[in-house]
Amino acid sequence: MFSIAAVRWKLLLAAGMVSLAAAPAYLCAQQKPRKAELQAISPTFWNLFEHGAKLTQVATGFGFTEGPVWDESDFLWVSDETLNEIFKVDVKTGEKKKVIALGDPDGSTYDKQHRLLDCASVLRAVIRLSPDGTKYTILADHFEGKRLNSPNDVVLGPDGAIYFTDPTSDLPKGAKQEIPFKGIYRIAEDGKLQLLIKDRTDPNGLAFSPDGKRLYVDDSTEQTIWVYDFKPDGSVANGRLFGKETADPKEGVPDGMKVDKQGNLYVVGPRGIWVWSAAGEHIGTIVVPEQPANLTWGDSDYATLYITAETSVYRISTKAHGFVPYL
């Protein structure tokens, strides 16, 4: 079995969507098969999970899954980066329905009006889909006259603005990098695009703390998680290291992340989902058979984690309740 990044790049290369020269070195490795399990590092891990909690497969047969978003109609939106589709997945039956063809869709979320936002890498844009998901509007694709790189993940901020990361990992084959850095941006409610951070090596997943005072961003190449103080005007300050996912990168790297109402972080990392306390302690890991890319809270009480991992979607019940910014 290949690592998540290697699987992704093999498929994107085969589709002619990316170039081999653009791939970071950590994307070319193999990993050993693994079984699903919960690995506690601290006893506090069991405050979040029952000892007998099981990870189960919801649906499979995808190309490469990303960007899950729970809808209260009991389905998941799921991006498929290699099949170039966004799907609706019935979580009771596992049935999947194609909604829209879209080149390399990635991280997703809802906005305040419950409209789906997606990072469309081939378009090099953040887009908003129509209510039925069949049409889209571009919200951001240029910064200061230059095209964005390849937007990767997106989150709704406590101020109602949209925040997203813009690495180069999904830059389309033959495309020129016009912006000389990999930024983290804010789309204000009036549509204005603002650069917040430009000194990260490979920004990927991002999330806000439940009190709206912190912005977390992970860096796939550095295998780090950073935290910033979030200000009422939408700016950030005092960036500092929150945690480091120290493991062989061929087992996976930091990617999507979510937060629960107590402030614990659930971050994609080597072998699965790394669970961090709000104080920055790695308290345990959800080991997933396929390497995850992203996750979301779901079900009526938002106590279930839905995880997109390579060709499948998985879920696990928790004793926590998810912090969902758009509710």
Residue ranges with predicted function:
Residues 43-60, 93-101, 133-145, 183-202, ...:
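Blade-edge beta-strand/turn elements of extracellular beta-propeller
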Residues 81, 121, 167-169, 220, ...:
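Short loop/turn segments immediately following the C-termini of beta-strands
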Residues 85-87, 125-127, 183-185, 224-226, ...:
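A short loop-to-beta-strand structural motif that recurs across blades of beta-propeller domains
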